[in-house]
């Protein structure tokens, strides 16, 4: 009798197949390959931020108190940037600055670099998570594309801007009041509000808020019928075949209001995606420009006339004077390592004074 030897119908799984099966299986919280980047980085970024705001001072880097331990509250606590003298050092715990000393590492601002880098990779991991899940259930990847906008803003503000300046010192510290200080710094030193990329960013964010409000109200106004369930989740069957609201009625309403209206849901929802994402991307591009110290609009003719004529002043020239005031008053406070001292007679005053 002849016995034919052949391969088993079930081939032996490789290590990659085993990992892929475990990572991508259906569970309450999806892990996925993106989770290998997302979960550790998000854990370390949040853990570093909570540790820094609770225990770590900014005395050695900014001359400030910045932790709950020192008396700050949620609005004033922060994980502060390293000192300007450390330039763009990665501030690794085992690096030449801290030499493995955790306390010294925290004093030097190592937690800021730790939180910033892990935060950036955590956000990228979250975007990849959306892309991976979309691929798994055969959706288009527009969620991931949309999330690229806040990633672009984070990377441009926290990483690219300080890379263009003299050090991480000029990045925002991770805290509420610290972000407010950074905004004032951006205005005083870069005239950020007059930057066209900032204008596009504001238009995108506020325009998106307006679109969301209009869209939500319109859908509520044109529901075919209210459900009789106790709440929204029980009122309607998620697998219903019919539409929930009348697009035709909504189109007629806004056609009468504005004279124009979206004719189909695809264009409507793409526009709601396009406005905020484009706005945030433009804002990120503008911050990259600031990293290179590119200037905003300059209306020099108005500045010259205001300097020659004490009675001539515009909102622009007043803002320029305010920016000078921010720089003069803020630099000495914000950069104590420079030992800046401005006599009162050189501090800016308006034409009226």
Curated annotation (Swiss-Prot):
Protein's membrane topology: Multi-pass membrane protein
Transmembrane segments: 41-61, 125-141, 153-166, 208-228, 279-295
Pfam families registered for this protein in UniProt: Photo_RC
Binding, a plastoquinone: 215, 262
Location of N-acetylthreonine modifications: 2
Any one Gene Ontology BP term: photosynthetic electron transport in photosystem II
Intracellular or extracellular location(s): Plastid, Chloroplast thylakoid membrane
InterPro entries reported in the protein's UniProt record: D1/D2 (IPR055266), Photo_II_D1/D2_sf (IPR036854), Photo_RC_L/M (IPR000484), Photo_RC_L/M_CS (IPR055265), PSII_PsbD/D2 (IPR005868)
Molecular functions per Gene Ontology: chlorophyll binding; electron transporter, transferring electrons within the cyclic electron transport pathway of photosynthesis activity; iron ion binding; oxygen evolving activity
The keyword Manganese appears for this protein: no
Manner of cofactor binding, per the entry note: The D1/D2 heterodimer binds P680, chlorophylls that are the primary electron donor of PSII, and subsequent electron acceptors. It shares a non-heme iron and each subunit binds pheophytin, quinone, additional chlorophylls, carotenoids and lipids. There is also a Cl(-1) ion associated with D1 and D2, which is required for oxygen evolution. The PSII complex binds additional chlorophylls, carotenoids and specific lipids.
EC number(s) stated in the UniProt entry for this protein: 1.10.3.9
Highest taxon listed in the record's lineage: Eukaryota
Residues engaged in binding chlorophyll a PD2: 198
A cellular-component GO term for this protein: chloroplast thylakoid membrane
Binding site for pheophytin a: 130, 143
Modified residues (Phosphothreonine): 2
Reactions listed under catalytic activity: 2 a plastoquinone + 4 hnu + 2 H2O = 2 a plastoquinol + O2
Binding site for Fe cation: 215, 269
Residues holding chlorophyll a ChlzD2: 118
Keywords: Acetylation, Chlorophyll, Chloroplast, Chromophore, Electron transport, Iron, Magnesium, Membrane, Metal-binding, Oxidoreductase, Phosphoprotein, Photosynthesis, Photosystem II, Plastid, Thylakoid, Transmembrane, Transmembrane helix, Transport
Biological role stated in the UniProt entry: Photosystem II (PSII) is a light-driven water:plastoquinone oxidoreductase that uses light energy to abstract electrons from H(2)O, generating O(2) and a proton gradient subsequently used for ATP formation. It consists of a core antenna complex that captures photons, and an electron transfer chain that converts photonic excitation into a charge separation. The D1/D2 (PsbA/PsbD) reaction center heterodimer binds P680, the primary electron donor of PSII as well as several subsequent electron acceptors. D2 is needed for assembly of a stable PSII complex.
Subunit structure, interactors included: PSII is composed of 1 copy each of membrane proteins PsbA, PsbB, PsbC, PsbD, PsbE, PsbF, PsbH, PsbI, PsbJ, PsbK, PsbL, PsbM, PsbT, PsbX, PsbY, PsbZ, Psb30/Ycf12, at least 3 peripheral proteins of the oxygen-evolving complex and a large number of cofactors. It forms dimeric complexes.
Entry similarity comment: Belongs to the reaction center PufL/M/PsbA/D family.
UniProt cross-references to PANTHER family, sorted A to Z: PHOTOSYSTEM II D2 PROTEIN, PHOTOSYSTEM II PROTEIN D1
Name of the featured protein: Photosystem II D2 protein
Organism: Cryptomeria japonica
Gene name in the database record: psbD
């Amino acid at each position: 009798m002849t016995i034919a030897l052949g391969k088993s119908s079930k081939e032996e799984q490789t290590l990659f197949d085993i990992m892929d099966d475990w990572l991508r299986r259906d569970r309450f919280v999806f892990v996925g390959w993106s989770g290998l980047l997302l979960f550790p980085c998000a854990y370390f970024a949040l853990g570093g931020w909570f540790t820094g705001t609770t225990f770590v001072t900014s005395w050695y880097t900014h001359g400030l108190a910045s932790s709950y331990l020192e008396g700050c509250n949620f609005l004033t606590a922060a994980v502060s940037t390293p000192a300007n003298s450390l330039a763009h050092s990665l501030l690794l715990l085992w690096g030449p600055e801290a030499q493995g000393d955790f306390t010294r590492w925290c004093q030097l601002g190592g937690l800021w670099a730790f939180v910033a880098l892990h935060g950036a990779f955590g956000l990228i991991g979250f975007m990849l998570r959306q892309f991976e899940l979309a691929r798994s259930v055969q959706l288009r990847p527009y969620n991931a594309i949309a999330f690229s906008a806040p990633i672009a803003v984070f990377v441009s503000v926290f990483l690219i801007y300080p890379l263009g300046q003299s050090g991480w010192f000029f990045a925002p510290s991770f805290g509420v009041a610290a972000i407010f200080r950074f905004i004032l710094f951006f205005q005083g030193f870069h005239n950020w509000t007059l930057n066209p990329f900032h204008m596009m960013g504001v238009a995108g964010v506020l325009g998106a808020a307006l679109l969301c409000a209009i869209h939500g109200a319109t859908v509520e106004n044109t529901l075919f019928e209210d459900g009789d369930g106790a709440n929204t989740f029980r009122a309607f069957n998620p697998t219903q075949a019919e539409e929930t609201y009348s697009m035709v009625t909504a189109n007629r309403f806004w056609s009468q209001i504005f004279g124009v209206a979206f004719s189909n849901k695809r264009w409507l929802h793409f526009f709601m995606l396009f406005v905020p994402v484009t706005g945030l991307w433009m804002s990120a591009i503008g911050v990259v420009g600031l990293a290179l110290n590119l200037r905003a609009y300059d209306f020099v003719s108005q500045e010259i006339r205001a300097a020659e004529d004490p009675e001539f002043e515009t909102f622009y020239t007043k803002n320029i004077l305010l920016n000078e005031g921010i720089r003069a008053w803020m630099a000495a406070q914000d950069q104590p390592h420079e030992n800046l001292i401005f006599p009162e007679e050189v501090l800016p005053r308006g034409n009226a004074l």
